[in-house]
Amino acid sequence: MKIRFMMLFGLLTLPVLAWAADALTGDVQRQPLNIQAIVMFLLFVGGTLYITYWASKKTRSRSDYYTAGGNITGFQNGLAIAGDYMSAASFLGISALVYTSGYDGLIYSLGFLVGWPIILFLIAERLRNLGRYTFADVASYRLKQNPIRSLSACGSLVVVALYLIAQMVGAGKLIELLFGLNYHVAVVLVGILMVMYVMFGGMLATTWVQIIKAVLLLFGATFMAVMVMKSVGFSFDALFKQAMEVHPKGAAIMSPGGLVSDPISALSLGLGLMFGTAGLPHILMRFFTVSDAKEARKSVFYATGFMGYFYFLTFIIGFGAILLVSANPEFKDATGALIGGNNMAAIHLADAVGGNFFLGFISAVAFATILAVVAGLTLAGASAVSHDLYSNVIKKGKATERDELKVSKITVLVLGVVAISLGILFENQNIAFMVGLAFSIAASCNFPIIIISMYWSKLTTRGAMIGGWAGLLTAVILMVLGPTIWVKILGHAAPIYPYDYPALFSMLVAFIGIWFFSITDRSETGQQERARFHAQFVRSQTGVGASKGSSH
């Protein structure tokens, strides 16, 4: 049955590829047809579809589908987490930010990295010991199942939806530039492949797609950085001096402070990036794919190492682009601007240091990056619906594995259709605020509930519900009333909320709400929930009673 379904999906994909071929000869303004990129892209897709077929034969149970049976090693999971987290926005966006702003780009990239020590020291071990498939398992461990799982699932789905839209729109624009494909074709293609990986291969296929993508991206970025350093005699001093001579801003690119207009926005952005990371459902879900808490800690250790190394490379790549791309008229259009915009700086650098073949490789890696991220997001969204809402809220924990998996796969299909539709709908919208909003909601709803449920004995369901919903709604409302939506999209003269990011205030609302409505909860249920903290604490520390990986 699975093989027939995959063949059907393959046949559905063929007209899209044919349509893509037609599109290549049509609306191609910025990037010419790159045969190497197309060939490498097809090789990657073929390889990952084979992995999906292999994974589908090993995915028999609910545990296999959600967590790959808990049999992923710490090292493999670390690579997969890095593959899940290092998006095309990280690779192209941060190197472009360094290309335009210099040192500020490095500061911005650190925002994505500093959340990981929090996950390593405060969350990973306890999350693995207490949970099974989703972070809602942890949040609802000693609290009322229905309301907490409903809140956690809503928080997860909102974050997944916003992040997914941003990735799909980014994917369409990126592929349009890299391959010359029509935007709508690119979005449909990403959506179909995303559904295939997750529906048939589950977490096992998603994990290996992310691992392969991480290895390819790290290899490509390393090669680019080495070639940049080779061009300046492996001297950072020479790299920075020559970059200052070439860049329009001169020595100002070595100074911080030009990125954010005021300290409140800077603090709010930093808090959102730092604590939002610890509340992203597709990242937290990865800790259940390993056998125990020790492997979960190893996962974060390896992931942080890989990502730290990667963000260091983007800094070199950005300065390399200043040196080798900005001064080369071959990469400029008639107006003197970079062909394809500043986000193409890393792609042009690949051409400059490795020629057409390496340009094709990096283009294919950029596409692989998108597929790996959207696959992880889709699985997280599907598990929130099937495991948290359907199995535990609607069926009160009495759903069969077969029914739960059926609901999960239907959800994957629905998410695929929704992602494609919204990706097309939001084609011409500014999607930067969606990523910021996704991190802000994760920091304002998911993170406070997870961290407080694990560490504070006085938490009650009432406090978690009121504080969690208050944080989520505050983040959304402040984002709507802020400069990005209220002024730039809705067209009002001035914003009601003057800052770009809401996390500073929405997190405060969430934590105060959780604290106040918990300590004022005198109900008998609240007393029982507090009394259950000791048993939760023992399990979170020792792992006694924690779910284990299955052996195949």
Swiss-Prot record:
PROSITE patterns, per database record: NA_SOLUT_SYMP_1, NA_SOLUT_SYMP_2, NA_SOLUT_SYMP_3
Gene3D superfamilies: Sodium/glucose cotransporter (1.20.1730.10)
UniProt GO cellular component terms: plasma membrane
Keyword annotations: Cell inner membrane, Cell membrane, Ion transport, Membrane, Sodium, Sodium transport, Symport, Transmembrane, Transmembrane helix, Transport
One GO molecular-function entry: symporter activity
Subcellular location(s) of the protein: Cell inner membrane
TM ranges: 35-57, 78-100, 105-127, 148-170, 185-207, 214-236, 266-288, 301-323, 364-386, 407-426, 431-453, 465-487, 497-519
BP terms from Gene Ontology: plasma membrane acetate transport; sodium ion transport
Keyword set includes Transmembrane: yes
UniProt KW Transmembrane helix keyword: yes
Pfam family, one: SSF
Topology relative to the membrane: Multi-pass membrane protein
InterPro entries: Cation/Ac_symporter_ActP, Na/Glc_symporter_sf, Na/solute_symporter, Na/solute_symporter_CS, Sodium:Solute_Symporter
Family from the record: Belongs to the sodium:solute symporter (SSF) (TC 2.A.21) family.
Its job: Transports acetate.
Protein name, as recorded: Cation/acetate symporter ActP
Gene, per the UniProt record: actP
